[in-house]
């Protein structure tokens, strides 16, 4: 087989980009040449740059909930973006297009169809996004992380449940029984993660909740870029003398952060849920209420049903409620939650997805 050229489509958030990076690394090891389709100013630029993959940027924006103006411009924008991707596919002799989500997937998938290039899509969330629901009809293969994501019997012949790929560094974190020492009397280590962009409600609520807890915690809080000053101020305005805390805009090494933590308070994006499950760590999920089709609540459902995590809807999130949940936890309770989540994980997802892509070339 000649050296395959694969165009990966992933943009906008870490939930799309990191799984695509994990699979790209595996495909590169097998000899594939990876190209990346993204947007000019998306976070994928900085994440993909260190890999050295050729990066192709197109102008494309989201549609849902963005107003009538963008809706009216969308046909022209989509046509222009699709033509740009056709040029990329032909100019780089692309053998396969693989979509992991983000605004670029729609024009990329359409371009694959028009150039008769095989298309594989992967849906990370428990409820499929609008672009992937559309592209599923024309894709060669449709991959889903959760069962019944697409709910379409017509897709059965090409539909496969594979889990969510995670990076090798995450998979390499020691299992819960090694990390948790139930005899350790030091303060519980609390990791607060608002996703790659941060979560203002966590930035506001967590400091107030900690002020209500007498038992000390050691806190590491990822607040999102541009939120560091206001989050530092939120901590400074409370009496937190019992606690140690660090605030930072972004955590580059999530594997080290998970290895450090006893419990995570976080959103329920697909990547976050999958990483917590793979690592095996106690979690309190606060799903983003504005997420399309409430997919974050659906993402967290398996872990919460198995008592591997606590679900705390944002409309119920108050400093008192969060402090009550945290106050009930000790290392033994965290370990039990972590073991249950770890037992549910699919740690072969990355290799499985790469196998499917390789076999389809």
From Swiss-Prot:
InterPro entries xrefs: GlcNAc_MurG (IPR006009), Glyco_trans_28_C (IPR007235), GlycoTrans_28_N (IPR004276)
Highest taxon listed in the record's lineage: Bacteria
Protein name: UDP-N-acetylglucosamine--N-acetylmuramyl-(pentapeptide) pyrophosphoryl-undecaprenol N-acetylglucosamine transferase
Lineage of producing organism: Bacteria, Pseudomonadati, Pseudomonadota, Gammaproteobacteria, Moraxellales
Pathway: Cell wall biogenesis; peptidoglycan biosynthesis
Membrane topology, record value: Peripheral membrane protein
GO biological process, one term: cell wall organization
Entry-linked CDD domains: GT28_MurG
EC number in record: 2.4.1.227
Catalytic activity annotation: di-trans,octa-cis-undecaprenyl diphospho-N-acetyl-alpha-D-muramoyl-L-alanyl-D-glutamyl-meso-2,6-diaminopimeloyl-D-alanyl-D-alanine + UDP-N-acetyl-alpha-D-glucosamine = di-trans,octa-cis-undecaprenyl diphospho-[N-acetyl-alpha-D-glucosaminyl-(1->4)]-N-acetyl-alpha-D-muramoyl-L-alanyl-D-glutamyl-meso-2,6-diaminopimeloyl-D-alanyl-D-alanine + UDP + H(+)
General function of this protein: Cell wall formation. Catalyzes the transfer of a GlcNAc subunit on undecaprenyl-pyrophosphoryl-MurNAc-pentapeptide (lipid intermediate I) to form undecaprenyl-pyrophosphoryl-MurNAc-(pentapeptide)GlcNAc (lipid intermediate II).
Binding, UDP-N-acetyl-alpha-D-glucosamine: 13-15, 125, 167, 196, 251, 270-275, 296
Keyword Transferase found: yes
Cell compartment(s), UniProt: Cell inner membrane
Statement: the UniProt record of this protein carries the keyword Amino-acid biosynthesis: no
NCBIfam families assigned: murG
């Amino acid at each position: 087989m000649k050296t395959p050229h694969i165009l990966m489509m992933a943009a906008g958030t870490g939930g799309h980009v990191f799984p695509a990076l994990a699979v790209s690394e595996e495909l590169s090891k097998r000899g594939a040449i990876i190209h990346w389709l993204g947007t000019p100013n998306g976070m994928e630029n900085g994440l993909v740059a260190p890999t050295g993959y050729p990066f192709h940027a197109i102008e494309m924006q989201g549609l849902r909930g963005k107003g009538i103006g963008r809706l009216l411009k969308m046909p022209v924008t989509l046509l222009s973006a699709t033509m740009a991707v056709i040029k990329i596919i032909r100019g780089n002799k692309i053998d396969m297009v693989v979509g992991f989500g983000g605004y670029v997937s729609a024009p990329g998938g359409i371009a694959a169809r028009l150039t008769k290039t095989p298309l594989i899509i992967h849906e990370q969330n428990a409820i499929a996004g609008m672009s992937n629901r559309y592209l599923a009809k024309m894709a060669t293969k449709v991959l889903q992380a959760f069962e019944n994501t697409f709910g379409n019997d017509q897709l059965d012949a090409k539909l496969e449940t594979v889990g969510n790929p995670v990076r090798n560094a995450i998979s390499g974190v020691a299992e819960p029984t090694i990390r948790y020492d139930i005899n350790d009397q030091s303060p519980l280590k609390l990791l607060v993660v608002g996703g790659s962009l941060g979560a203002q409600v966590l930035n506001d609520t967590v400091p107030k909740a900690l002020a209500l807890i007498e038992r000390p915690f050691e806190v590491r809080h990822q607040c999102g870029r541009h939120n560091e000053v206001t989050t530092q101020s939120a901590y400074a305005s409370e009496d937190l003398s019992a606690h140690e805390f660090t605030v930072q805009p972004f955590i580059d090494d999530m594997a080290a952060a998970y290895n450090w933590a006893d419990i995570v308070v976080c959103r329920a994006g697909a990547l976050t849920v999958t990483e917590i499950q793979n690592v095996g760590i106690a979690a309190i999920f606060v799903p983003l209420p504005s997420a399309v089709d409430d997919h974050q609540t659906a993402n967290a459902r398996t872990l919460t049903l198995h008592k591997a995590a606590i679900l705390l809807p944002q409309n119920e999130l108050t400093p008192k409620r969060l402090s009550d949940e945290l106050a009930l936890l000790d290392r033994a309770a965290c370990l039990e939650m972590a073991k249950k989540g770890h037992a549910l994980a699919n740690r072969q997802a990355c290799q499985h997805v790469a196998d499917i892509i390789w076999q389809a070339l």
